Swiss-Prot record:
One of its GO terms (biological process) is electron transport chain. The keyword Hydrolase does not apply. Its cofactor is FMN. InterPro entries: NqrB/RnfD (IPR004338), RnfD_bac (IPR011303). NCBIfam families: PRK00816.1, rnfD. This is Ion-translocating oxidoreductase complex subunit D. It holds the Pfam family NQR2_RnfD_RnfE. One of its GO terms (cellular component) is plasma membrane.
Length: 352
């Protein structure tokens, strides 16, 4: 009998980076569809702007660095960066904002470090945070979901608002943000934080139209459930591992439950945390970035739990209504330390 001698590794994963990125893009379809349904065509326009900007920015840098443009663009990482940023910002944000954020994410947060695999921070979240800090008003100007909105825009009107700031009939963001109660609407998390600080009781807050959903905020609960469905599909396809999403969601739910039990007058209930904002998007599509997340199983559990704790702390006591982006970046900082202390022991070697 003849034995073939082969060098390690002895097991192989045939999935290329482009294949994994494509799976993530496909898994985003339910979440995108839900955002289109509840927040209008602006989401699609932002995705198109971000995608084109990401591809052009990456191609420009690769050309300047004299690297293969076609081969690198085929990995779909630039497209995914643009997509994640586009679905994270308000659907009617000015066109130049998504372009600026995407270009910053690709050139500064990714290519400046050497490209895919070298960046320590999630590029899409870097772009988001830069926009949020620089343009807080525009970045928090979300439309009310269609079920409680007074004005529902068509595709052409959405384009006009994004590029000119008003509709053909003269409507602007102030009128478009009005809900059925005649009050400018915000996200469920933003509404809760602002109302508590204004001295409103939780009973009063829960009567607002934005909380007319079955489980959490109107529209937002279904958007989060759609992102959850896409995330479960990614797990089924084995494109991501379960450790980070599970530890993130369990930690966030546990902290929110304990906080709500001890201080129900000032802290949001767990279902609002889990089904509002970017919770499910962050859990399955952002935190699971293989480049910027921990690489060991124990490390992934710690990484996800840390992010969940940070999200709850920022939402409950910080200055921003949704803390997913900041939590992701802060958790990214700790990855080298987490990996160092959770790396598995080499068989046959003792510690120390």
């Amino acid at each position: 009998m003849v034995f073939r001698i082969a060098s390690s590794p002895y097991t192989h994963n045939q999935r290329q980076t482009s294949r994994i990125m494509l799976l993530v893009l496909l898994a985003a379809v339910p979440g995108i569809a839900a955002q289109l349904w509840f927040f209008g065509w602006g989401t699609l326009v932002q995705i198109l702007l971000a995608s084109v900007s990401a591809l052009l920015a990456e191609a420009l840098v690769l050309k300047l660095r004299k690297q293969s443009v076609a081969a690198t663009l085929k990995d779909n990482s630039a497209l995914l960066t643009g997509l994640l940023l586009a679905v994270s910002i308000p659907p009617l944000a000015p066109w130049w904002m998504v372009v600026l954020g995407t270009v910053f994410a690709v050139i500064i947060a990714k290519q400046l470090y050497g490209g895919l695999g070298q960046n320590p921070f999630n590029p899409a979240m870097i772009g988001y945070v830069v926009l949020l800090i620089s343009f807080p008003v525009q970045m928090t100007s979300w439309l009310p979901p269609h079920e409680i909105a007074v004005n529902i825009l068509g595709f052409i009107d959405a384009i006009q608002v994004i590029f000119s700031g008003h509709t053909a009939s003269g409507g602007d963001m102030n009128t478009l943000r009005l809900g059925i109660d005649g009050i400018s609407q915000a996200t469920p998390l933003d509404t809760f934080k602002t109302s508590v600080r204004a001295g409103h009781s939780v009973e009063q807050i829960m009567q607002y139209p934005i909380y007319s959903g079955i489980l959490a905020g109107a529209g937002w609960q279904w958007v989060n459930l759609a992102w959850l469905a896409g995330g479960v599909w990614l797990l089924w396809q084995k494109a991501i591992r379960w450790h980070i999403p599970l530890s993130f969601l369990v930690t966030l739910a546990l902290c929110a439950t304990l906080g709500w039990l001890f201080s129900p007058e000032t802290l949001a209930a767990p279902q609002i945390h889990l089904l509002s904002g970017a919770t499910m998007l962050g859990a399955f599509f952002i935190l699971t970035d293989p480049v910027t997340a921990s690489t060991t199983n124990r490390g992934r559990l710690i990484f996800g739990a840390l992010a969940g704790l940070l999200v709850w702390l920022i939402r409950s006591f910080g200055g921003y209504p949704d803390g997913v982006a900041f939590a992701v970046l802060l958790a990214n900082i700790t990855v080298p330390l987490i990996d160092y202390y959770t790396r598995p022991r080499v068989y046959g070697h003792r510690k120390g």
